[in-house]
Structure formats: structure tokens, C-alpha cells
């Protein structure tokens, strides 16, 4: 009992409350009906699985729970203090608190998770993606405690998780590998010498790495030491192991991976390949299956090589064998991820399978559900990862509330895998992914068209997202042609990050109309509440007897103020003059569900857009795209709210100061590293914006800095003094 009291228990048994919240998720319709019953699976050792603990959070925890419920298996969630009100907690049958927000004290605490499994009487643990999913010690601990680990045996995690070991095993199994150094000597000098031997550019990679963490490209010996130290710090934080390997970096390769499954009976199959070449910060952003332009004979060779890799380590469960492929479709083994991948839904869409169900059945001792001959490839699928990040600021992750969230309608060919709802917070403590948008169609072009259509219907207000960037990417001619590689985003950076275009005058008219109609709706509500229809505050129509009323309105498009003269016509329409052009505007607001729509006609051209007005910004979402128009703050208010930046760099986001390189009195050059922040599982180096002398450092190592707060102050230079005078 004492052990059980170490974790606080939240029994999520309120069926009414849980199902009240689920419809807003827009999850794909299911053919099963959940009833209060359980299903038993018997493992090879005779153990039953009636309850599974998901040792993860967010969308992957919700994904696993849906399949478990389909099979009648009860689900147990774990959560940190930051996730107390999260979606995966609400979906679970039981949920247990396991500590503070930092992952090291919660989701990476093996002892706490094992204790929850015992307390809840869960027979199995599904690790999801990330966290402990590829941790050999955790898999071994589950085995010692008699708990079924839904994943490969600890030996396979060890052999494939240590990249130096995996390369040797793959070479022995006849799988081609990339030239590199995978030795035990981890001294900086040894690694530098091997980098010189291999020849620049090289890739520094964490031995236990994954997800782009602890990975750096080094193009010259001069930058080797700084990049090595940065990779070590990030690897230590993410995997508690800073051992590194060095590999030859192949310019503009393709990243092609193969989904494999093994079982306890010695069987192994492949479920075709996925192309994950388009990446930023060495992390995938859009994936597709099958890989474009791959001929059937190459596809077969890839699959067979992946199966050889799995069999070489007696693999059990879901795994992904990753390859580097050149322009001639020659491929080399890169690594094997011993878990279910984030992008697994695209494989499910083209094969008609449920890979989480396969995981559960195989963990229970069953054979792989289909033979290799029975696994067929149908159609084409894309997955777009929707992140809370700012593409224009080097894809810097952001945190904050999802003030408004609406998604495309889910159907059998459109899936939305998410772990958040409207009103939820994207936390600074975890990965900033909001959702995965997955679409399927009969061929690649049709799937791509569906992807872009669905992205336009994915509307988020409250923080920066990469949705517009994904639209630009998926519409790029080279992407449409299937000419993808890992340097795609850097190569086409200018085209993908187009400068913000000035809004069309017709769009400004729409925004002005939306604001006017919202004001009128608020006035009408006031009238109803005040019960005084003769109050002078009860009308916003602008109508006057015998005269026309004209209102001067100012909106802000980007950095430009736009003057709009709005004349209220007697028939309820509006004449809007912008510069020397006049537009006849008519429209109304209506609601669908929780959303407000603006139906509008500008000079006879009808349109429909979702309208959101939040604080001082008007948001319009339509099939043509989205626009944001600001309502300028009066000068007497803006002067009160303005802040001084104190001449130094600001924190790009909320995070922890990991390393401080400077102190008061130090002279620095523009571009010098000042400090390192850790935020949202990524390391960010703060560089000096100018030459100068450090006057004050506001944070020490280990301190928490809030977004947009000054980090370093510089001494005022003589030129600055003269300008201020």
C-alpha cells in the first residue's frame, strides 16, 4: 500500500464526461462499438493481456488507446503535472500521475511507470514513440517484473540502438552500410582524426540517437569541436548517453525506410517503404508511402534487405529499417528504429492494416497476421506533421494555447492523429507537434491534391504553426514531381518561405465587413441583455435619416496601415473605398457548430470564409488560403504597452539556460555564441546580434527564461549615445 501511495491516482471512469469531449476530435469514424467488456490474449508463456499501460503522452498515446479499445483491452495512462487535463488522460480507463513536467522526472522514470503497472494490474506496457520506447534497460526491467513489453526483446534494442554495433551486424548480414567510425574510443581527438580520415563533410550522430537529436553536420574541421560539444549535450539530455559515431555525410540523399514486423515464431515480413526525405532540423516533416519513383525490383530489394536486418537480431514486433538512397537508387543501411514510428499511419493506409493491433497480437504470442504474399500495396498516402513552430524563424518551436482549432472532416481516406483539443496548451516541456494529417488516394497526384485541400481546412489560432509552409511545400513543382531529397528544404528555402504578400483589396473588404458584422452582433446581444431597445447604444447599423453615414476605418496589413472609408447604405450593403477604388460589399454571419462563417459578396463575387476575431487580429480562413489583418492599437495604448529590448538578444521561447559562455565585461563579435537554451527537446544556441561589450547576463545555467525576455545586455556604445541624443 505504501508503494501504491507513491503515485496519485485519477480514475477516469466518468463515461459521460469522456464521450462528451470526444466528438470535437474529428477522429475517423470506426465500425466498432465500445462496450464494458474485455478481451484476453494469451502469450506464449500463458499470460493474459486484459489491460495495457501506455507509457507515453500526446497523439501516440491516444492512437494506441483507440486500437486497444477496439480489441476490448482496458487502457491505463500516465501523466505529468503539465498533462493533468490532457486528451490522453481523458481517453484512458485509468490514469496515474507520475511526477513533475520535466521528462526526466516523469515519462522517463522507469521505476514510477513500473509501479503504476503493478498498481493498476496492467499485464503489458506499450511504450509508444520516444521516451522509453527504445530503452533496453526499461525492456529488461519489464521482463524482470513479469510485465509484457510491447516491443522487441532487450537484446535487439541493444544491438540496434547502439549504432556502432548495428553497423557491424548489418554488414555481417549482407546489408550495405555507410563508411564511418563506430569505435569505443570517444575522445575528442580520436573522433576528430576519424572525421579527417573519412573526409568532410561528416555527420556526428549520437550512438543511441533518434529523431534528429544529437545529430550535427560538420562541413569543415574548424567547426568540428563546437558541433561535437553541442551534439554531446543534446544526446546526454535526450538519451542520457553522449557517445558519438562519425559517418560520411552524403549530400542530397533520399531517406527511405522500410516497415518490418517479426514474431516469436521466427517469421518476419516487410510492409513496403516510406519516403521521409523532406526534413528540417534533421526531423521529418512530411512523409509518403510508397516512395515516389521506386521501381518494383528496387522495392523488393529494399524489403528483403530490411527483413534480413530484422532476422539478424531475432526481431519481434514493429520496427523500421532506415536507408540512405542515392539518385540511382543504390541504398545503404543507416539505422533501425526498434519501435513504432511516428509516420506509421501512411503504411497502414496503403496496406489496409492496423499496426498497433499487430503489435498487441504479436506481443500476446500470436503469429504475424499476414504472410508476405498477402501484404499488398494499394494507392498512395501522405502524412503532414503539423507543428507549433515558426518557419520564418528557423522553425523555432513555440508554446502556447490553441485558442481556436478546427480540422478537416475525417473519413476513411483522411485521418487526424492528435493529442490536443481546442483550448489545450502546447507545452514548452515536450515536442511541439500538434497533429498528423494523413490522407490516402488511388495515386500520388490525387493524394497530393487531397493533402493540400485538407491543409487549407486545418485552422489554428493562438500560436504560430507550419501549415502555410506545408502548403507551399506540397505545392512546389519539384515536390509534385517526386524529386525529393534531404536537402529539399534548404535548396528551395526562398520559394518555400515566401515573403508575406499584401492582402488583396477584396480581402481587406472581407475583413472590414467581418469586423462590422461582429460589432453589430455584439450590440444586438447587449440590447437583449439591457432590455432597452431605445438605448443609444442599441444600434450599430450606421443608418441616418436622409443622409448616408460614412465611417473611417483603419486596418493593418502586415506593417502597412490601410485606410478604408465605409459608407452604410440604406439597403444594408456597404460601399468601401480603399485608395481610389470603391467596392460594393454585402454579407452576413452564420454559425456551423462552434465556428462563425462570413458569407460575403464583393462587387458581385461571392465567397465564404471562417471568421475569427481574437484580441486585435481578424483571421479569415477559406479554401483559397488564410489571411490575418490587424486592428491597430491606438497610440496612447501602444506607448504604454511597449517594451525595451535593452540592446541584447531576447529568449526566442520559454526554456532552460543550459550553458552560458560569457560574463560581464567580455567583448564579443556578431555571431559569437552567448548561451545555449534547451526548449521543447531541442538545443538552441543564442548568438550575439552585434559587436559589443557584455554589460550584464540576466540568467545563470539551469535558470528558466520566459519567451521574449532579455538574456544579455550590452554596454551602450558611443554611436548609440549620439543617436539617442
From Swiss-Prot:
Using the record's annotations, give every residue carrying the modification N6-succinyllysine: 581
N6-biotinyllysine PTM positions:
681
| SMART domains documented for this protein | Biotin_carb_C
Entry-linked Gene3D superfamilies: 2.40.50.100, 3.30.700.40, ATP-grasp fold, B domain (3.30.470.20)
| Endpoints of the signal sequence | none
Entry binding sites for ATP: 163, 205, 211-212, 255, 282, 322
The catalytic site is made up of 339
Domain ATP-grasp, which positions? 167-364
Question: Which reaction(s) does its UniProt entry say it catalyses?
Answer: 3-methylbut-2-enoyl-CoA + hydrogencarbonate + ATP = 3-methyl-(2E)-glutaconyl-CoA + ADP + phosphate + H(+)
Q: What range does the transit peptide cover?
A: 1-41
Is Iron included in the keywords of this UniProt record?
A: no
From the UniProt record, give the pathway where this protein acts.
Answer: Amino-acid degradation; L-leucine degradation; (S)-3-hydroxy-3-methylglutaryl-CoA from 3-isovaleryl-CoA: step 2/3
Q: Which disease is it linked to?
A: 3-methylcrotonoyl-CoA carboxylase 1 deficiency: An autosomal recessive disorder of leucine catabolism. The phenotype is variable, ranging from neonatal onset with severe neurological involvement to asymptomatic adults. There is a characteristic organic aciduria with massive excretion of 3-hydroxyisovaleric acid and 3-methylcrotonylglycine, usually in combination with a severe secondary carnitine deficiency.
Relate the protein's function as given in its record: Biotin-attachment subunit of the 3-methylcrotonyl-CoA carboxylase, an enzyme that catalyzes the conversion of 3-methylcrotonyl-CoA to 3-methylglutaconyl-CoA, a critical step for leucine and isovaleric acid catabolism.
Q: Could you tell me what this protein is called?
A: Methylcrotonoyl-CoA carboxylase subunit alpha, mitochondrial
Amino acid at each position: 500500500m505504501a508503494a501504491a501511495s507513491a503515485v496519485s491516482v485519477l480514475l477516469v471512469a466518468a463515461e459521460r464526461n469522456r464521450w462528451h469531449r470526444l466528438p470535437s476530435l474529428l477522429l475517423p469514424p470506426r465500425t466498432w462499438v465500445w462496450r464494458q467488456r474485455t478481451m484476453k490474449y494469451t502469450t506464449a508463456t500463458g499470460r493474459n493481456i486484459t489491460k495495457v499501460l501506455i507509457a507515453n503522452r500526446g497523439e501516440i498515446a491516444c492512437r494506441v488507446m483507440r486500437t486497444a479499445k477496439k480489441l476490448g483491452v482496458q487502457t491505463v495512462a500516465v501523466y505529468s503535472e503539465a498533462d493533468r487535463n490532457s486528451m490522453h488522460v481523458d481517453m484512458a480507463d485509468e490514469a496515474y500521475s507520475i511526477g513533475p513536467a520535466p521528462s526526466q522526472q516523469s515519462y522517463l522514470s522507469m521505476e514510477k511507470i513500473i509501479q503504476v503497472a503493478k498498481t493498476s494490474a496492467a499485464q503489458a506496457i506499450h511504450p509508444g514513440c520516444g521516451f522509453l520506447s527504445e530503452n533496453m534497460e526499461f525492456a529488461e526491467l519489464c521482463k524482470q517484473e513479469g510485465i509484457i513489453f510491447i516491443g522487441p526483446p532487450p537484446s535487439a534494442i541493444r544491438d540496434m540502438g547502439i549504432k556502432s554495433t548495428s553497423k557491424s551486424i548489418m554488414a555481417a548480414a549482407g546489408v550495405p552500410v555507410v563508411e564511418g567510425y563506430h569505435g569505443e574510443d570517444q575522445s575528442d581527438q580520436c573522433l576528430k582524426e576519424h572525421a579527417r580520415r573519412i573526409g568532410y563533410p561528416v555527420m556526428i550522430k549520437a550512438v543511441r540517437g533518434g529523431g534528429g537529436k544529437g545529430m550535427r553536420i560538420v562541413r569543415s574541421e574548424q567547426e568540428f569541436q563546437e558541433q561535437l560539444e553541442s551534439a554531446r549535450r543534446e544526446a546526454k539530455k535526450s538519451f542520457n548517453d553522449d557517445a558519438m559515431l562519425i559517418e560520411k555525410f552524403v549530400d542530397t540523399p533520399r531517406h527511405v525506410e522500410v516497415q518490418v514486423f517479426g514474431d516469436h515464431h521466427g517469421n518476419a515480413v516487410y510492409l513496403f517503404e516510406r519516403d521521409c526525405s523532406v526534413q528540417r532540423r534533421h526531423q521529418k516533416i512530411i512523409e509518403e508511402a510508397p516512395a515516389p519513383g521506386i521501381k518494383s525490383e528496387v522495392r523488393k530489394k529494399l524489403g528483403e534487405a530490411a527483413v534480413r536486418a530484422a532476422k539478424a537480431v531475432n526481431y519481434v514486433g514493429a520496427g523500421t529499417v532506415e536507408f540512405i538512397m542515392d539518385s540511382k537508387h543504390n541504398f545503404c543501411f543507416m539505422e533501425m528504429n526498434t519501435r513504432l514510428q511516428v509516420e506509421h499511419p501512411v503504411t497502414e493506409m496503403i496496406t489496409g492494416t492496423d499496426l498497433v493491433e499487430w503489435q498487441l497480437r504479436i506481443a500476446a504470442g500470436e503469429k504475424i497476421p499476414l504472410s508476405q504474399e498477402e501484404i499488398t500495396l494499394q494507392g498512395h498516402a501522405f502524412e503532414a506533421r503539423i507543428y507549433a513552430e515558426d518557419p520564418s524563424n528557423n522553425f523555432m518551436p513555440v508554446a502556447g494555447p490553441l485558442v481556436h482549432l478546427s480540422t478537416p472532416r475525417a473519413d476513411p481516406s483522411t485521418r487526424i492523429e492528435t493529442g490536443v483539443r481546442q483550448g489545450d496548451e502546447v507545452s514548452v516541456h515536450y515536442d511541439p507537434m500538434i497533429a498528423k494529417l494523413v490522407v490516402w488516394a488511388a495515386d500520388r497526384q490525387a493524394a497530393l491534391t487531397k493533402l493540400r485541400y485538407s491543409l487549407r481546412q486545418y485552422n489554428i489560432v493562438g500560436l504560430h504553426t507550419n501549415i502555410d509552409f506545408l502548403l507551399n511545400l506540397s505545392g512546389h513543382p519539384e515536390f509534385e514531381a517526386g524529386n525529393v531529397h534531404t536537402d529539399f528544404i534548404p535548396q528551395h528555402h526562398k520559394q518555400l518561405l515566401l515573403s508575406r504578400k499584401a492582402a488583396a483589396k477584396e480581402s481587406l473588404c472581407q475583413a472590414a465587413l467581418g469586423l462590422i458584422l461582429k460589432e453589430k452582433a455584439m450590440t444586438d446581444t447587449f440590447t437583449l441583455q439591457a432590455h432597452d431597445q431605445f438605448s443609444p447604444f442599441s444600434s450599430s447599423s450606421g443608418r441616418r435619416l436622409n443622409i448616408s453615414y460614412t465611417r473611417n476605418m483603419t486596418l493593418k496589413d502586415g506593417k502597412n496601415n490601410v485606410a478604408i472609408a465605409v459608407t452604410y447604405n440604406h439597403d444594408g450593403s456597404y460601399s468601401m473605398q480603399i485608395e481610389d477604388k470603391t467596392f460594393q460589399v454585402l454579407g452576413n454571419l452564420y454559425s456551423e457548430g462552434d465556428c462563425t462563417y462570413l458569407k460575403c459578396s464583393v462587387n458581385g463575387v461571392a465567397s465564404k470564409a471562417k471568421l475569427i476575431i481574437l484580441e486585435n487580429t481578424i483571421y479569415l480562413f477559406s479554401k483559397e488560403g488564410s489571411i490575418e489583418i490587424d486592428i491597430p492599437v491606438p497610440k496612447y495604448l501602444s506607448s504604454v504597452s511597449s517594451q525595451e529590448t535593452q540592446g541584447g538578444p531576447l529568449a526566442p521561447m520559454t526554456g532552460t539556460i543550459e550553458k552560458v559562455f560569457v560574463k560581464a565585461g567580455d567583448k564579443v563579435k556578431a555571431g559569437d555564441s552567448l548561451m545555449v537554451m534547451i526548449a521543447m527537446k531541442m538545443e538552441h544556441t543564442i548568438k550575439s546580434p552585434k559587436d559589443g561589450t557584455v554589460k550584464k547576463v540576466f540568467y545563470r545555467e539551469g535558470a528558466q527564461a520566459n519567451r521574449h525576455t532579455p538574456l544579455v545586455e550590452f554596454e551602450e556604445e558611443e554611436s548609440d549615445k549620439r543617436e539617442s541624443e
